[in-house]
Amino acid sequence: MNFSAKTVVVIAIGAALYGIGGLPMFGVPVFANTTLKPAMAVLALFSVLFGPIVGFLVGFIGHWVTDLFAGWGVWLTWVLGSGIVGMVIGLFPMMTKNRLQQGELPMKDFALFVVLALAGNVVGYGSSAFLDTILYAEPFTKVFTQLSIIAAGNTILIAVVGFLILKSVAKRNKQSRNLTEA
């Protein structure tokens, strides 16, 4: 798979923003080793704008960066989970026929965005929780509680912040499409 220079730069910027924004100092601790991160909105934005492959790589590399800088070691199971979240949310442009790029954001598209955010969090971090119980013998109740908190919290955060961002993107795209030469 060959990436254009633009795509590589987008992935690098997205991963850096998501990775640094995911550090504990920017999050809200809610449970054992569980933090709600506003950086999830960054992952959602890059996924929606650039698709599932970029979304996966921004989530995967960005979470890796978070774990490296946080100092608790890289948890590949949760790194993979963030990649899956980005990939699932990245399906948005294909499922909406790129209406956002045309300056449109009907409520059905926003509802789909929220459903993809929830599905991405449940599937992505559900995979992480499952792998933690298998590979690291983590207690099921602990990882299930982490999954429940993360999926609900991230979905709410992505929905609220994402709505504001998506409305702004749609407005900008609509204005740029309406420019005419005088």
Curated annotation (Swiss-Prot):
Subcellular localization(s) per the UniProt record: Cell membrane
InterPro entries per UniProt: ECF_substrate-spec-like, UPF0397
Domain of life: Bacteria
Record's keyword terms, sorted: Cell membrane, Membrane, Transmembrane, Transmembrane helix
Chain ranges passing through the membrane: 8-28, 41-61, 72-92, 110-130, 146-166
Coiled coil: none
Pfam families: ECF-ribofla_trS
Keyword Protein biosynthesis: no
Membrane topology annotation: Multi-pass membrane protein
GO CC entries: plasma membrane
Family (UniProt): Belongs to the UPF0397 family.
NCBIfam families xrefs: PRK13661.1
Protein name: UPF0397 protein VS_II0189
Organism (species): Vibrio atlanticus (strain LGP32) (Vibrio splendidus (strain Mel32))
